[in-house]
């Protein structure tokens, strides 16, 4: 039977609040107008996407959301965010590469969470 570290076991207000803050940050990052997005060297935006969605996956698991449900929701959210960026007057563009980075971030976040869960003796 798998048991998380004690600090990860409680799905209380702190874990749910952390997930809520991560979602709000993602909304601000993903839907900021193009003028508000700082310029960066090539590839940095993909790293930001990966880290953002890894954070969403980790905090979502800590909040108690089941892995399969969370993965489906986050990958769907990533796809919708790219479509909205492409269709909206934000001056942003849709990118399959961004979506792939988002999906990879979900996988990384879930893998890190799974690694934090340890097998209990017995």
Predicted regions and their residues:
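Bulky hydrophobic segments
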Residues: 1-99, 103, 107-122
